[in-house]
């Protein structure tokens, strides 16, 4: 795990478009390299969206693997990039304006795997509370907590 964390740290120096292309390529490889997860995704889509063709399901599953891989590599920016760089890269345009949120409690939902850490950056501009589940791997748990608390 520490080697993977070191690799992520190195990747945070790359420009975002290059990091995105690498993430998409890694996701394509993961689609073929992890048949168990691919099968689970196909099963879920068959059950939830029986009207889709196999080609449509394959496209969705492939894009999921690519998006998930991109999000992991792009987290390196969120965790280690200088704050001025993050401010240039992240544009916060909330679907629910803060003025509307001040009328009472509001629950914001974020896709868990793809943008959870980006939502943490967004939380810096308005008061929010989050939920966190400790990870089994201590090195990974320490990294997630560091990245989300910075």
Question: What are these model-predicted stretches?
Answer:
Residues 1-107, 113-115:
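Membrane-proximal helical "anchor" segments flanking the first transmembrane region
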Residues 103-150:
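Catalytic core of membrane glycerolipid acyltransferases/transacylases, capturing the structured
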